[in-house]
A protein has these predicted regions:
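Loop/turn-rich, solvent-exposed surfaces of beta-rich toroidal or solenoidal domains
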Residues: 199-241
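Conserved blade-ending motifs and adjacent loop-strand segments that build the rim/top face
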Residues: 245-265
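Structural motif
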Residues: 57-62, 110-121, 168-185, 232-238, ...
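Structural signature of eukaryotic scaffold interfaces centered on beta-propeller domains
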Residues: 39-46, 83-100, 145-158, 166, ...
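A short helix->beta-strand "capping" segment at the edge of beta-propeller domains
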Residues: 19-37, 197-202
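Surface loop/turn motifs at the tips and blade-to-blade linkers of beta-strand repeat domains
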Residues: 30-36, 75-80, 137-144, 204-210, ...
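Beta-strand-rich domains and repeat architectures in extracellular enzymes and scaffolds
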Residues: 28-58
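Blade-loop segments of beta-propeller domains
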Residues: 68-108
Length: 288
């Protein structure tokens, strides 16, 4: 019965999806990440700077959005199981006077079903560092009915969202496997360095049809923007977080490779790719 209800929910949230067309142009190449042979994953943007994360928790690489210049490399503790699949800046500052808001990063791993919150600091001389100030631990995937959790934050509404799959597969749509979106409250960093969620903390669950490989995600204006897929089989999906309905989906026109990170800059969607290309959308997205 539970499976029947889930399938019904999938059908309800996908009826009437607007097919639209969003095109992308390449704006620069992440030379440093590729030279270091880092496996590019989630990314986010703040203060005109792109913060690129990598698999295995390799250093965070910072680029100038104006010209793609490499600015610096932030050393963090390398951890093989940390995938860093999604990253998103909030609009919350740890302390008044901080240059950057808190950065939320999902480890997106069956064993590491958690996210970490970074405080990014910059000195007057321009040196940038990152410190983990909070760890968010989510229920076991089998308990919450969501595998490969990716985090996206809506700080304005006070929520965090996890996206993932109802079965332990990110590339097969069999057995009713579907994309899940779970809503949790967004805890304050003042609540402590470790927050453990349980299944009763799930405030809302939305379901959508299966799409291969959840990739970068971010929230703007009450809508979740997320890229899916790999080379030749990728798309951008916009979901209304008040209803769970998909507003539109589009092929990633102009992006031949695998999308990884997603952020916003000057009201445009920015997508970073596994091979180092950085793309900008022709779609204008207003909001915070």
């Amino acid at each position: 019965m539970k499976r029947i209800l889930l399938l019904a929910s999938v059908l309800l949230t996908t009826i009437g999806i607007a097919q639209t067309s969003v095109s992308f142009e390449k704006i620069f190449y992440e030379t440093h990440s590729r030279e270091q042979k880092y496996n590019i994953q989630g990314a986010s943007i703040a203060n005109g700077k792109l913060f690129q994360l990598h698999d295995g928790n390799k250093p965070i690489v910072v680029y100038d959005m104006r010209n793609g210049d490499f600015l610096t490399e932030i050393n963090v503790e390398p951890i093989k199981t940390w995938h860093n699949n999604t990253a998103c800046f909030s609009n919350i500052y740890y302390e008044q006077g901080d240059s950057y808001p808190l950065l939320y990063v999902s480890e997106e791993n069956i064993k590491e079903h958690k996210a970490v919150v970074y405080r990014i600091k910059e000195t007057k001389e321009g040196a940038i560092s990152a410190e983990i100030i909070q760890t968010l631990i989510f229920p076991e995937p089998i308990e919450m009915g969501l595998y490969y959790p990716n985090i996206a934050v809506d700080a304005d509404a006070g929520f965090l969202y996890l996206t993932g799959f109802s079965w332990e597969s990110w590339n097969k749509g069999e057995r009713g496997n579907a994309v899940q979106i779970l809503r949790f409250r967004l805890p304050s960093v003042k609540e402590g360095p470790v927050i453990k969620f349980c299944t009763k903390d799930i405030l809302k669950r939305f379901c959508s049809d299966f799409k291969v490989a959840t990739q970068g995600a971010a929230v703007r204006g009450g809508k979740l923007y997320q890229v899916f897929g790999g080379p030749g089989n990728s798309c951008l999906v916009c979901t209304d977080l008040s209803t769970g309905a998909e507003v539109f989906r589009s092929e990633l026109n102009g992006i031949p490779g695998e999308p990884e990170g997603l952020g916003f800059h000057n009201d445009r969607i920015i997508v970073t790719c596994n091979e180092g290309e950085v793309y900008r959308s022709d779609l204008i997205v207003k909001g915070n």
